[in-house]
Swiss-Prot record:
The modification Phosphoserine is found at residues 526, 765. It is found in: Nucleus; Chromosome. This is FACT complex subunit SPT16. Component of the FACT complex, a general chromatin factor that acts to reorganize nucleosomes. The FACT complex is involved in multiple processes that require DNA as a template such as mRNA elongation, DNA replication and DNA repair. During transcription elongation the FACT complex acts as a histone chaperone that both destabilizes and restores nucleosomal structure. Residues 480-496, 1020-1035 have a biased composition (Basic and acidic residues). Keywords: Activator, Chromosome, Coiled coil, DNA damage, DNA repair, DNA replication, Nucleus, Phosphoprotein, Repressor, Transcription, Transcription regulation. One of its GO terms (cellular component) is chromatin.
């Protein structure tokens, strides 16, 4: 059992403090009662949870604590009681006023638990009728299910006067001791570090005009708490602030709340604010808030970043800084009430800038510690019943909202928040625990001047149309069979696209150097990140199988162990230590050689292997191999086969474990028990958890959706809103089904299968389709209706499809609405789609607002465009009718995505679409070896970008190099072999189309002197096709 690091001296000191103070609580309770059910990660600031953290530094679920005169009773499980056993001796001291009793409950004996509950209620009743509890606490779980009926009955029977003790508890843990102040310093330093990361990401997004929402930028920062490499970089600064005898542990770092980023024209300065799904607005001001907690002690920091501010905004920000200094230095004094503090702040504003008084926040912060916002100690005009004391720690948070800039007429807001400690020493002034820069020069950024200068420099060349591409464009248009486009307007668009791509490539290279450093290298010279996974066959001798007494080789499948008889004793070898073996027969003996993992065997362990097969140490001794012989050949053969099968099974199990390593256990779905649950009936799901395909139902609940199969109650799929990355609706227009597609952030398990996409669909039409082309003649025997009936049938089908689209679109919108802003519905744009082969078969790919998708034929394709680093268009060369697309992701560990065999007619459109989506692309005439490219990129990404990044490809795609290659191609003269090859390729597909093209549209395009240019490619192809057909007839 893992040993918990509980400081029992602190536990005794604090529980005695609580015992000595509770008689002074409002309402004079005779006893205190704290009941904690299951842990609630959604609300970690309930009073009982805070009490556990204050006393033990841990939360003990399913535990009851009662304080009655002379004793403290704790009812908990036997496993948790073992951790608290040491505390009992501390309370046996004769000077101690109370004793501690541990009562152990048992989940399997509800009658015993009820007796314990009755006994503790009897003690409470004997203490008096007034019982103090935290009334607003609300817990769930089996423990609460057992306790609540007993307590409710006892309250009625004994006529208990139950009172709320939240205010009294707030006063008990208000003053922070030295250790608590140290924990607050650690958490505050963590907030500084994450604010620095947030500001860098925010400034980069504004500077590069990235299309990112406030919420997505917030999620990006929030996910950094799971980045072990980043946390290790913070460790030296944070560990120096820890209390003596407390070792820093970055696993104790967590978010107080999700980072809040606000931009645009609407701002919320309350602590309950959330990041919106609006685009990050890089003008005016951006408010950013971070809160980190360490060992459950909270901190908070808020900064205002000014983007191209006017003089009025800058002056008001200067006043904000002055006001903060005034509050902390001169107003926040021990002995004053929050009402006096707030009124003093208002007086100062009225004296200095009276026009800002209506815009000032209704409070200037609150007490902070184990509770992020103590509602019983808010610094506002209503709080006249508390007084500031030495040792208090405050989140000083205030600002001005709904300000209007006279220059731009835009709304803006200013806000500052810092964690401030009032020291225990009277000679020391209040101390800022959060120290991230707030100086105006450091938080102000100016971009407009630079952009205006750049626009002036680039305005003249941007409108200039070069003459050289104009000549080549005609040739290119003919060879690729695209639509006829010409003139200066098309050439100008092409030039603009090239310039935009050039900027995107420059930005890509610049970002690469910013994202990576030399420390990110993971090449052959870097230190391998390898580890050893411990294993154990048996803990005690009694666990060995009973049949080992025959001193034969045994294979214990249950313990994954080979048991060998050595010197008359069974010696276990875990299958993980076994490498390979061999079996040979020599004379009457059969020899079995077993080789084990050991240092130095087979040239050592490759650096590519992450998991070491053994733990190398100077103290360890290894067995390299063991050879056994026996006259019982059949027995040895059977044993060798069992060992081989056990090794295969262990290897397979380990591969499955690694494959499912990225599967995240979702939180529990909270069912909607109030109001009407929205549902969508008669739908099918892909993939299907059942073997049979039957219509089912999907429900919308409080924090997610649930697909429920009618076949079995346990056959269902729960998807939380927080795990949905993309919610996509695809109409049945042009398709046989209507679809709501859900692409997940983290895969979930369906049985033993890992899935990242879940799709709900319904077939759009159940009508039979006549594919014979015979009309009524083909089925006159069965169909007697005329054209009017057929027309009415078609109209009815259109109505059904429209109603189906409306029903599914309404349900998709309902999912987005229930997510409280986490999700938005994306629609597919069929008009922008194109054919391609992302897997094995040709499908129709379509873009949405943020993705490129294929949702009709499994396996589905969902490419998030914001995750794409670059797109490479491969096999783009003269004479080929299709090309390939390769998407490289910003996460270089993620495999690239191929979409093959895209028609060449889509090339120009896709180039423009990629440019519009701010995705740089390059063009290659060949298929590249992506395994080699990505391997070099992963080994040392910093050196990759230092050497020019993606410039090793055809940078800018449509650059001058491609133009020159086109000129060379235009002088190509076809040989007989080449012509016959091309005609053979196109004969079946284009035979009749070539004639139509030459006699129709193509002839109208060429109004110049064709005698100088000679026959074009289509004409040569046509002749070759006729020649081949003639040769076939002769044959």
């Amino acid at each position: 059992m893992e040993e918990l690091n509980i400081d029992f001296d602190v536990f005794k000191k604090r529980i005695e403090l609580l015992y000595s103070k509770y008689n002074e609580f409002e309402g004079s309770p005779n006893s205190l009662l704290f009941v904690l059910g299951s842990s609630n990660a959604e609300n970690p600031y309930q009073k009982t949870t805070i009490l556990h953290n204050w006393l033990l530094s841990y939360e003990f679920p399913a535990t009851l604590i009662a304080l009655v005169p002379g004793k403290v009773i704790i009812i908990t499980s036997s496993a948790k009681a073992k951790h608290l056993q040491k505390a009992i001796d501390l309370f046996k001291d004769p000077e101690s006023k109370i004793t501690l009793e541990l009562w152990q409950r048992n989940n399997k004996e509800p009658e015993l638990n009820k007796k314990l509950f009755d006994d503790v209620i009897a003690l409470i009743n004997s203490a008096g009728k007034t019982v103090g509890i935290p009334e607003k606490d609300s817990y769930q779980g089996k423990f609460m299910t057992e306790w609540n009926p007993v307590w409710e009955a006892a309250v009625k029977e004994n006529e208990f006067n139950v009172i709320d003790i939240s205010l009294g508890l707030s006063k008990v843990w208000e003053v922070k001791d030295v250790n608590e102040q140290a924990f607050l310093s650690v958490s505050s330093k963590g907030s500084d570090k994450f604010m620095d990361l947030l500001s860098n990401e925010m400034v980069r997004a504004v500077d590069e005009e990235l299309k990112i929402t406030n919420a997505k930028l917030s999620d990006k920062i929030e996910n950094k708490i799971d980045d072990v490499k980043f946390l290790k970089q913070l460790s030296p600064d944070l560990s120096a602030l820890c209390p003596p005898n407390y070792k820093f542990n970055f696993d104790l770092l967590d978010w107080t709340y999700s980072p809040i980023i606000q931009s645009g024209k609407k701002f919320d300065l309350r602590v309950s604010a959330r990041s919106t799904n609006d685009q990050l607005y890089g003008n005016g001001c951006i408010l950013a808030s971070c809160g980190i907690r360490y060992n459950n002690y909270c901190s908070n920091i808020t900064r205002t970043f000014l983007i191209d501010p006017s003089e009025e905004m800058a002056n008001n920000y200067d006043f904000l800084l002055t006001l903060q200094k005034e509050i902390v230095t001169n107003i926040l004094k021990p002995g004053r009430t929050p009402k006096e503090v707030y009124e003093s702040v208002i007086e100062y504003i009225e004296k200095t800038k009276p026009e800002l008084v209506p815009n000032f926040t209704k409070n200037i912060g609150s007490l902070i510690g184990l509770e992020f916002r103590d509602s019983n100690f808010i610094l506002n005009v209503k709080n006249d019943y508390r007084k500031i004391q030495r040792g208090d720690c405050f989140n000083i948070s205030f600002g001005f909202n709904n300000l209007k800039d006279s220059q731009s007429a835009n709304n803006y807001a200013l806000q500052l928040a810092d964690t401030v400690q009032i020291p225990l020493d009277e000679t020391e002034p209040p101390r800022f625990l959060t120290n991230y820069t707030k100086a105006k020069s450091q938080i102000s950024f100016y971009f407009n001047n630079e952009e205006e200068d750049n626009n002036k420099k680039k305005s003249s060349p941007a409108t200039k149309v070069p003459s050289k591409p104009d000549r080549n464009s005609k040739i290119l248009r003919t060879k690729l069979r695209g639509e006829a486009r010409g003139g200066a307007e098309d050439a100008q668009k092409e030039q603009i696209r090239k310039e935009n791509q050039k900027k995107l490539h420059e930005k890509l290279e610049k970002n690469g150097l910013l994202r990576f450093s030399a420390a990110d290298a993971n090449g052959p010279d870097s230190e391998p990140r390898q580890y050893f996974k411990k294993y154990e066959s048996y803990v005690r001798d009694s666990q060995l199988p009973t049949n080992i007494r025959d001193l034969r080789i045994h294979v214990d499948w249950k313990s994954q162990t080979i048991i060998l008889p050595i010197y008359g004793r069974p010696v276990p070898f875990h299958i993980n230590s076994y490498k390979n073996g061999s079996k040979n027969e020599e004379g009457e003996y059969t020899y079995l050689r077993l080789n084990f993992n050991s240092p130095g065997s087979s040239g050592g362990i490759s650096k590519k292997v992450e998991e070491l097969p053994y733990e190398e140490s100077a103290d360890n001794q290894f067995v390299r191999s063991i050879t056994l012989r026996s006259k019982d050949g059949d027995r040895m053969s059977e044993t060798f086969k069992q060992i081989a099968d056990l090794k295969k099974e262990a290897t397979k199990r380990e591969q499955e474990r690694k494959a499912l390593a990225d599967v995240v256990q979702q939180d529990k779905l909270i069912e909607n028990k109030t109001g009407r649950t929205k549902r969508l009936d008669q739908i099918f799901v892909r993939p299907n958890p059942d073997t049979k395909r039957v219509p089912s139902t999907v429900f919308i609940h409080e924090n997610g959706i649930r697909f429920q199969s009618p076949l079995r109650t346990d056959s269902r799929i729960d998807i939380l809103f927080s795990n949905i990355k993309n919610l996509i609706f695809q109409s049945c227009k042009g398709e046989l089904i209507v679809v709501i597609h859900i692409h997940l952030k983290n895969p979930i398990l369906m049985g033993k299968k890992k899935i990242q996409d879940v799709q709900f669909y319904r077939e759009a039409s159940d009508m039979s389709v006549d594919e014979t082309g015979g009309g009524r003649r083909g089925q006159s025997r069965f169909r007697r209706y005329g054209d009017e009936d057929e027309l009415e049938q078609e109209q009815e089908e259109r109505r059904k499809r429209a109603a189906l689209d409306k029903e599914f679109k309404y349900f998709a919108d309902a999912i987005a609405e229930a997510s409280n802003g986490l999700l938005t519905v994306e629609n597919t744009f069929r008009d922008l789609g194109f054919q391609g082969v992302p897997n094995r078969s040709a499908v129709f790919c379509m873009p949405t607002t943020d993705c490129l998708v294929q949702l009709i034929e499994p396996p589905f394709l969902v490419i998030n465009l914001e995750e794409v680093e670059i797109c490479i268009l491969e096999r783009v060369q003269f004479g080929l009718k299709n090309f390939d697309m390769v998407f490289v992701y910003k996460d270089f560990n993620k495999p690239v995505t191929h979409i093959n065999t895209v028609p060449i007619e889509s090339l120009d459109f896709l180039k423009q679409w990629l440019t519009d989506m701010d995705i740089p692309y390059t063009v290659s005439t060949i298929n590249l070896n992506w395994a080699t490219i990505m391997k070099s990129l992963q080994d040392d990404p910093y050196q990759f970008f230092l050497d020019g990044g993606w410039n090793f490809l055809a940078t800018g795609s449509d650059d001058e190099a491609s133009d020159e290659s086109e000129e060379e191609v235009s002088e190509y003269e076809a040989s007989e072999d080449d012509v016959s090859d091309e005609s053979a390729f196109s004969e079946d597909e284009e035979g009749s189309e070539v004639d139509d093209d030459i006699s129709g549209d193509e002839s109208e395009d060429y109004t110049g002197d064709e005698s100088e240019e000679g026959e074009d490619w289509d004409e040569l192809e046509k002749k070759a096709a006729r020649a081949d057909r003639g040769a076939n007839f002769r044959d």
